[in-house]
């Protein structure tokens, strides 16, 4: 980026999808992408799917991102699904951004689903539904380091503060990262 990009609340189609994921390098030069809406589909985010990509040095603010396919939708403030050695570095999602979906645990403030992905030096102040402050679902090969989330959760069950779900077969590493939020439990 050479400047902030303001979508003025217009709709945005996610960059990359399952058939043709984003595989390049995106360096935001510490600017912001602001005020966009992504709704619908299987992969909702600024980037829908990234594989072997390098995405770094920018923030998202004022966005509304919602995955709407009932059982398989992923949503993330930066990327919905990341894999194949993707690196997310020095990116953030600011307060005023809402990330949600129809499936619990499949959306996160930064990324909805990760496998073989490194996330380094990120933060999220997003409002999330039943997802994670940083990651919704962390599968094998996920590395999260030097990152934090400070979220507002709007759903029942509530979202969690860093990662909603970690694959129990192992292979996820979390170092020097934490999450805080507005509540720790939900009751009717």
Regions found by a protein language model. Give the residues of each.
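Surface-exposed repetitive/solenoidal architectures
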Residues: 1-188
């Amino acid at each position: 980026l050479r400047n902030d990009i303001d979508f003025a609340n217009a709709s945005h189609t996610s960059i990359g999808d399952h058939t043709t994921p984003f595989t390049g390098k995106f360096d935001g030069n510490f600017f912001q992408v602001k005020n966009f809406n992504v709704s619908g589909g299987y992969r909702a985010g600024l980037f829908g799917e990234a594989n072997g990509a390098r995405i770094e040095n920018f923030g998202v603010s004022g966005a509304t991102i919602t995955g709407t396919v009932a059982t398989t939708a992923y949503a993330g403030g930066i990327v919905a699904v990341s894999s194949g050695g993707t690196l997310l570095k020095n990116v953030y999602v600011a307060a005023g951004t809402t990330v949600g979906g129809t499936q619990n645990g499949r959306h996160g403030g930064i990324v909805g689903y990760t496998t073989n992905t490194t996330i380094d030096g990120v933060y999220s102040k997003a409002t999330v539904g039943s997802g994670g402050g940083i990651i919704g679902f962390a599968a094998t090969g996920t590395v999260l380091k030097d990152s934090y989330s400070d979220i507002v959760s709007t759903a029942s069950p509530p979202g969690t503060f860093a990662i909603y779900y970690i694959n129990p077969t192992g292979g996820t590493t979390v170092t020097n990262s934490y999450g805080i939020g507005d509540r720790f439990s939900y009751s009717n």
